[in-house]
Amino acid sequence: MQTYNGYANYETWLVSVWIDNDQYTINYWVDVAKHHYNISEDRKYFTKKEEAIISFSEDMKEWYGDRVPDSDDIGGLFSDLLHAALGSVDWHELAGKYMEQALENVEC
């Protein structure tokens, strides 16, 4: 499987770069990760941390997807391209990365 700069693909790397280059944004996502960890619990098949990463990744995907302008505003082609790019992002990988940062030397 081909990767890009250590990430699953270019799209995943790009989202990470944009998050990491803005202190407010990274703080926001680390706080959201902490929240998901705090409300999660061990399940039959997943640990508390795994459960938190799953719900956190879904939250990230929804948050970014909701920010794509309606196709009426930017044209069908461009809306479709944005959705395709966001659909290629490995949200689970990113959620895992920011969950690690949230749990690093911090008592949730």
PLM segments and residue spans:
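Acidic interaction surfaces
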Residues: 1-108
